[in-house]
């Protein structure tokens, strides 16, 4: 039984470092995903600017209303391979971040549970020694 307590105590001491390492991974992935999001925004802005600048032979804007511009944007964005790749990368990064947050939550729960168990058994041990 003492071996289990020692293992739990060791695990309890390791968990803060493990949690900290995962938090740093989240920070790095968040920064990387922000860079990807900025690239996405830049490409989308360029597509919108290009659409706004399209004119016919008479110099009249081809996409004169918001609905037409939005439809053209969706079509152009769907055809832009770089944009599609960046969006796929961004979605993957966001998934990784979510999974890391779940991992932190699990480790935090483990930490609370181990602490509670050790406190419970320590208190019971003290009470049994009083008799």
Predicted stretch roles:
Residues 8, 47, 114-117:
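Generic structural signal of hydrophobic/aromatic residues within well-ordered alpha-helices
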Residues 2-5, 123-131:
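Short acidic DE-rich linear segments
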Residues 56-94:
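Short, glycine/alanine-rich amphipathic alpha-helical segment
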Residues 8, 15, 120-126:
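Short A/G/S/P-biased low-complexity tracts
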Residues 30-42, 81-120:
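Long amphipathic alpha-helical coiled-coil segments
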Residues 1-27:
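Short, charge-rich amphipathic alpha-helices with coiled-coil/heptad character
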Residues 29-70:
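Extended alpha-helical coiled-coil "stalk/arm" regions
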């Amino acid at each position: 039984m003492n071996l289990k307590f020692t293992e739990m105590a060791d695990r309890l001491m390791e968990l803060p470092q493990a949690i900290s390492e995962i938090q740093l991974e989240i920070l790095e992935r968040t920064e990387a995903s922000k860079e990807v999001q900025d690239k996405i925004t830049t490409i989308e802005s360029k597509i919108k600017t290009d659409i706004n600048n399209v004119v016919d032979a008479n110099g009249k804007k081809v996409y004169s209303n918001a609905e037409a511009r939005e439809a053209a944007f969706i079509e152009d964005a769907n055809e832009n391979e770089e944009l599609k790749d960046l969006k796929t990368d961004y979605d993957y990064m966001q998934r990784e971040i979510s999974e890391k947050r779940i991992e932190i939550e699990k480790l935090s729960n483990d930490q609370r549970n181990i602490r509670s168990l050790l406190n419970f058994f320590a208190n019971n041990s003290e009470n049994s020694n009083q008799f």
